[in-house]
Amino acid sequence: GIVAQPEQAVSRLPLLDAGRRQQLLADWNPPACAAAFLPVHEVVAANARRWPDAPAVAAGGAVLSYAQLETRANQLAHQLLAQGLPAGARIGICLPREPSLLVAVLAVLKAGAAYVPLDPDYPPARLAVMAADADLAALLVDAVTRGCFADQGAHLLQIDAMQEELGRCPTS
């Protein structure tokens, strides 16, 4: 303290003894532990187990509960796997901002693939270039966006026309 070091500048004197300093800086301020990283599709699955009837997504007048979102994503993921797409395949998604878009994103992730977002508001020529550059293994589209990819080599999957097939797929 000041008695032991009278020539020391006040700004250099310790304000706390070693025990109090330890308490304030270490004991009361533990290092933050890193939050566990979970991919978004696993977070949605956990939420579906916790709150199955809670609304998960609402858009375009449609509302899906967590259970419905999880079920539809699982069914589409099984359909994607049935197509024989390799793990890590790039799958384009060109859908309007409706619940089906989120279902598609989750399904692609559940299938072990990577999704390539394609904005349906882009001009068809731009979408074609983006799809070609991405070297897509498949494209998830609907009746409206299908026409943008008529000349693409990628496998087109029109999800609004697959409802009967999807209904036969496993839900988990």
Predicted regions and their residues:
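A structural boundary/capping signal
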Residues: 23, 28-29
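Carrier-protein-dependent adenylate-forming modules in NRPS/ANL systems
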Residues: 1-15, 30-172
